[in-house]
Swiss-Prot record:
GO terms for cellular component: cytosol. SUPFAM superfamilies: S-adenosyl-L-methionine-dependent methyltransferases (SSF53335). InterPro entries: DNA_methylase_N6_adenine_CS, HemK-like, Ribosome_uL3_MTase, SAM-dependent_MTases_sf, Small_mtfrase_dom. This is Ribosomal protein uL3 glutamine methyltransferase. Belongs to the protein N5-glutamine methyltransferase family. PrmB subfamily. Its EC number is 2.1.1.298. It catalyses: L-glutaminyl-[ribosomal protein uL3] + S-adenosyl-L-methionine = N(5)-methyl-L-glutaminyl-[ribosomal protein uL3] + S-adenosyl-L-homocysteine + H(+). PANTHER family: 50S RIBOSOMAL PROTEIN L3 GLUTAMINE METHYLTRANSFERASE (PTHR47806), RIBOSOMAL PROTEIN UL3 GLUTAMINE METHYLTRANSFERASE (PTHR47806:SF1). It holds the Pfam family MTS. The keyword Hydrolase does not apply. Keywords: Methyltransferase, S-adenosyl-L-methionine, Transferase. The lineage of its organism: Bacteria, Pseudomonadati, Pseudomonadota, Gammaproteobacteria, Thiotrichales. It comes from the Bacteria.
Length: 314
């Protein structure tokens, strides 16, 4: 933490919301913080930090930024800025909350911070890839982490049963907490499984997965902020495709005949395309940014199964 003298100097000299936003920006700039866990700019990060610290809605009137802060509010902001700027802890871990597809999730360092572009797909109700959302009665979220993808899908597929899967007991504890938070225990369940191992022949209309996909080289060079996240949720072998390859090979056995598989592989997209040059992957595009998300239908998985086996065994 900052020294007692520095804290007192800050408290004595900075008084308004505006003051603390400006100071937050200065501290983050001085410490070369990285933004990749929700905010897109240093301004957005500073505003989010300060307003969250004092429990004020982010759509406040611009006149309110001149409001004076209580000493206790200043102390909370100072603590948050120290963690974010000096320790370079991602802001969602400081706040213990993250937003995904318009929903709030409780998170901590046991799970990766929700930030997948799949959120846009969920908000758009999977259009144009799923024609009738009422036809989807079962959804599987593989490598669920906080449960954000599967739980957000519950808003789209209101009558579907949703299964969340993770191999991590810690992640499942967080996912179960979020299921209860959103009062979805009647149709969303979380189970421990190494991908499909404990699903015992169940069939799903939609499988969505944001598995670990960071290759070893990228993991070693990632900004400090990412090293707060569980390594299990990031690392996926030399090419970043250890889990994605298993999912692609096994998914058809757990899908209905009209089923759809969506998998995020991030930058490992290029390794996968090079590995499988003859496979016509559908790569989804996102208006809000993001790439490396593939879509395969049940029919495509069956049609190219032998080719996948050949490519993945090289």
């Amino acid at each position: 933490m900052y020294s007692q003298q520095k804290q007192q100097d800050i408290i004595n000299n900075l008084h308004t919301i505006r003051d603390y936003i400006r100071w937050s920006i200065s501290e983050m700039t001085a410490n070369n913080v990285y933004f990749g866990h929700g905010s897109e700019s240093i301004w957005d990060e500073a505003v989010h930090l300060v307003l969250s610290a004092i429990n004020v809605a982010h759509d406040i009137d611009s006149n309110m930024v001149g409001s004076r802060l209580l000493t206790e509010e200043k102390k909370i902001i100072i603590d948050y800025v120290y963690q974010r700027a000096c320790l370079r802890k991602p802001l969602p871990y400081i706040l213990k909350k993250a937003w995904f597809a318009g929903m709030e999730f409780d998170i901590d360092e046991r799970v990766i911070i929700p930030r997948s572009p799949i959120a846009e797909l969920i908000r758009n109700e999977f259009s144009p890839w799923i024609n009738d959302i009422d036809d989807v009665t079962s959804v599987l979220d593989l490598c669920t982490g906080s449960g954000c993808i599967g739980i957000a899908c519950s808003n789209v597929f209101e009558d579907a049963n949703i299964t969340l899967v993770d191999i991590s007991d810690d992640a499942l504890a967080v996912a179960n907490h979020n299921i209860k938070k959103h009062q979805l225990s009647d149709r969303v369940r979380a189970i421990k499984s190494d991908l499909f191992d404990n699903l015992h022949g169940q069939k799903f209309d939609l499988i969505v997965s944001n598995p670990p996909y960071v290759d070893k080289q990228d993991l070693d060079t990632m900004p400090h902020e990412y090293h707060y996240e569980p390594k299990l949720a990031l690392e996926a072998g030399d090419d970043g495709l250890d889990l994605a390859k298993r999912i692609i090979l096994e998914a058809d056995k757990y899908m209905t005949e009209n089923g759809v598989l969506i998998v995020e592989v991030g930058n490992s997209q290029y390794a996968l395309m090079e590995m499988c040059p003859d496979i016509p992957f559908t790569w989804l595009s996102f208006a809000d940014g993001g790439d490396g998300v593939l879509l395969l239908t049940y029919d495509e998985l069956v049609k190219y199964k032998d080719a996948f086996k050949k490519y993945f065994q090289k």
